[in-house]
Regions:
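C-terminal lid/capping helical subdomain adjacent to the catalytic/cofactor pocket in oxidative enzymes
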Residues: 32-36, 49, 210, 380-408
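N-terminal Rossmann-like FAD-binding beta1-loop-alpha1 element of flavoenzymes
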Residues: 36-63
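Short hydrophobic core segments
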Residues: 39-41, 65, 229, 237-249, ...
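Active-site substrate-recognition segment that forms the wall
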Residues: 52-57, 116-122, 237-241, 246-384
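Glycine-rich FAD pyrophosphate-binding loop
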Residues: 55-77
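Dinucleotide-binding Rossmann-like beta1-alpha1 core, especially the glycine-rich loop
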Residues: 81-166, 175
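Flavin (FAD/FMN) cofactor-binding and adjacent substrate-gating region
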Residues: 131-210, 215-225
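Conserved beta-strand-loop-beta-strand element in the redox core of flavoprotein oxidoreductases
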Residues: 215-236, 242
Length: 408
């Protein structure tokens, strides 16, 4: 499995409340009312987004549980930059159609919603590769014949001209790709997440954060359904509808029958000198699906975030019953081979930064599905349980839209 993007979306799981637009499963579960008790497990991107959009639609009894306050230390959304683009991940016609709907609505949210608009940066996005195999995979992500906004790049000097002179000094060996001049860029993930949580609270959502009071230890399985959750302090949280949005930790609460695999990616920050920051400001997102990607420096610290491209890491642990699963853990370090990949990317693009020390490093966990499509639906057996998981490294774009609408 190859991660090819990070996107960000905030409407996600509430599309499953009142309409059937994205239904893949129907049931006879009773409809909720505006005053029904709604419980969300997880206050990361999708959990917080779901809470916000439920509150915006008038639901008055919404509670969110998480072992950390927003932004959670282990949330993939607790990050500076996430790519915003409408790129595809499949050749399947039905999946393409759904992705286009989600991407269009999410992008409209980033561009027009007053809550999210301040955090979106329309810098443009380069999508590229440097081998025949990579170019074939790039052909799934980018369809230049369908988008006049794309400019084809084939020569090193074309890549270097994407930024002011002195920024992209590399040789770009073998690189070929397409540059989206507008309608793509990045969002400040952490700030958008915090803003969404604050707005949800203002609208009446109750956030219960910290350990033990916010750490869910089990769902309440009762009468062949899910009726809420139990936290580490022993408190029972009963609900008419439970939303499971626990990110990479979601498999610890439910058997997903090998549909999900928590996978870790690696990222670093490189600090610029104060006098360098203006030169690098507003550069487009530079993404090679075989090498990695990086962004313009953040305004607060003047640091460039860089991610290397690789199949991802797992942490396989065997439980007492013999079950083996990948268990996420927090770590502000990356493996040595990941550092080598980051520095190789910099040598090809910005060699002047290739030997600088990292000011920050982290592994970032996502719940991956086999085809990188989201798993958002009512559970086929537990009809009061709504799943919002399988973000697959690209669910962050959905912060700005209401994906669970219709699933409750």
């Amino acid at each position: 499995m190859n991660r090819t993007s990070h996107s960000f979306d905030f409407h996600s799981v509430t599309d499953f409340l009142n309409n059937n637009r994205f239904h893949t499963h129907q049931s006879n579960v009773m409809a909720v009312t505006k005053s029904s008790s709604l419980l969300i497990v997880g206050a990361g991107t999708w959990g917080t987004s779901t809470a916000l959009h439920l509150a915006r639609r008038g639901y008055t009894n919404v509670t969110v549980l998480d072992p950390y306050p927003v932004p959670s230390a282990i949330s993939a959304g607790n990050d500076v930059n996430k790519i915003i683009s409408s790129g595809q991940y499949t050749n399947n016609k039905d999946e393409i159609e759904i992705n286009e709907i989600l991407a269009e609505e999410a992008f409209n949210g980033w561009k027009n919603d007053p809550l999210f608009k301040p955090y979106y940066h329309d810098t443009g996005l380069l999508m590229s590769a440097c081998s025949q195999e990579g170019l074939e995979r790039l052909g799934v992500r980018v369809r230049p014949g369908e988008d006049p906004n794309l400019v084809e790049l084939t020569r090193p000097e074309q890549f270097r001209k994407l930024a002011p002179e002195g920024v992209l000094q590399g040789d770009f060996p073998g690189w070929k790709g397409y540059f989206a001049r507008s309608g793509a860029g990045w969002a400040h993930a952490r700030n958008a997440l915090v803003a969404a949580a604050r707005e949800a609270q203002r609208l009446g959502v109750k956030f219960v954060a910290g350990t033990p009071q916010g750490r869910v230890v089990t769902l309440i399985f009762e009468n062949n359904d899910v009726k809420g959750a139990v936290t580490a302090d022993g408190k029972i949280w009963r609900a008419e509808r439970t939303f499971l949005c626990a990110g990479a930790s979601v498999s610890q609460f439910l058997d997903f029958m090998n549909q999900l695999r928590p996978t870790a990616w690696t990222l670093v920050h490189v600090a610029l000198k104060p006098e360098e920051r203006a030169l690098y400001k507003n550069i487009p997102v530079i993404f090679n699906i075989e090498r990695g990607f990086f962004f313009e420096p953040d305004e607060e610290r003047g640091e460039i975030k860089i991610c290397d491209e690789h199949p991802g890491y797992t942490n396989m642990v065997q439980s007492a019953d013999g079950t083996v699963m990948s268990i996420p853990f927090e770590k502000t370090q990356i493996p040595k081979e990941a550092e080598a990949r980051v520095r190789a990317l910099l040598k090809e693009t910005m060699p002047q930064l290739a030997d600088r020390p990292f000011s920050f490093a982290r592994i970032c966990w996502c719940a991956d599905t086999a085809n990188r499509e989201f798993l958002i639906d009512r559970h086929p057996q537990y009809h009061s349980l709504v799943l919002g998981c399988g973000a697959s490294g690209r669910g962050k774009t959905l912060t700005s839209r209401d994906v669970t609408r219709g699933k409750s």
